[in-house]
Amino acid sequence: MMPQQDDFLQQLYSRRGGIKLGLGRVADAFPVIFEKNIPVYHVAGTNGKGTAVYSLDHILRSNGLKTGRFVSPHLLRYNERISVDGADIADGEVREIYDYLEKKIGNFEELSFFEITFLIAWKYFEISGCDRAVFEVGLGGRLDATNVIGGPKTDIITSIGLDHTHILGDTLEKIALEKLGIVKKDDLVLIGGSADPAFDKWMAEVALSKGAQSVDDDSLDLEIAFPPSCMSPEQRKNVRLAVKAALMSEEKGLKIPDFSGMKIPARFEFIEPDIVTDVAHNPPAIGSLAKTVKERLGKVVVLYGAMKDKDVTKVLDLIGEITDSIYVVNLEADNDRGAKVWDILDRAGSKVSNKIKYAETDEKTMEEALAFARQNGKKLLVTGSFHTVEKFMSYKKYS
């Protein structure tokens, strides 16, 4: 009898055990299961990857192409990570491909959670007959499991910022080199512009030195239909990157679709008229989010949780500009990398320490945050991590 899906997923989750960068294991496994070449869009960057991936998927499907989409992490269900034509992979298909991989791959037991998930995605896209596949890099690029995909392909580097510095390096240049590690010979490369033209020029030179066929930026003189109030300026930039990438890569005649119906989970997403979710988790992303909130919503109430390795002090200072009330939840119970409430309190600067609130349980904290926001006629912003949004959505029983 096939084990229940929850039991099976627990087996898969048990392989998490922290980040395991390195291509050796998955580079041995990938050729064993590879059967069909699929034209690939490969998306790396500190922030904005999700928006670019969902936008590319939307553009390609709107032009009649069958697409595979690979993202991470998921919010509520593992299946969200892998989809074909916008529909998540079914439980039975996950298990069927997992069993196939286990029998086929000699070093299967050495593979990490992310590596197995990537291999499941690739095989599912092959089986489904996808015309295109859009892959989001998990972390960095050079040593990410997705980097076993060969070229030529189309690469997007959305942005470069200081995040995961203990793994990727402590300067923008070091981090950029990790992201640019996805570039292969004859790839088309698109780089999201920064505030420093000299830095952008250096990145383009690095990409060309790796054999890129061409390197371009996100400038685009085309009218794109954006929802008037939903997308932030940063999201619009990443949509433009996706449009430019598709125009560079596809046949002439590609139509730019209307983006008003496109849903990007937890990227300035209103899950109720007075509740906004956003997975911003580092200073550049929170800074961009805070700017959008100021312009669109004014003062809000914030529900916040974080991972231990984030720059909590700087993030809280930025959040403090848009709120007088920061309700904090404990993420350690959900993830061994999560920060406790006390960790966040200890790292809160003098500007915001008097704004922080919490209750005896996370459920009570979330209940109080939402009630306080509604009593005062303000929006509730849920942010700081994928896990913060997941916790709140599970509490509210969204699916």
Model-derived features: positions:
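Hydrophobic alpha-helical packing residues
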Residues: 56-61, 125, 319, 348
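Conserved catalytic-core segment of NTP-binding enzymes
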Residues: 142-143, 150-210, 312
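Short functional linear segments
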Residues: 1-45, 52-54, 58-65, 70, ...
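Nucleotide phosphate-binding/pyrophosphate-handling subdomain across enzymes
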Residues: 127, 132-135, 144-156, 160-161, ...
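ATP-dependent carboxylate-amine ligase catalytic core
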Residues: 23-36, 62-150, 168
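C-terminal helical cap/extension that packs against the catalytic core
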Residues: 194-219, 316-379
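Active-site-proximal loop/hinge segments that shape catalytic or ion-binding/gating pockets
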Residues: 385
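Short Gly/Thr/Asp-enriched flexible loops that form oxyanion-binding sites at enzyme active sites
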Residues: 56, 142-153, 393-396
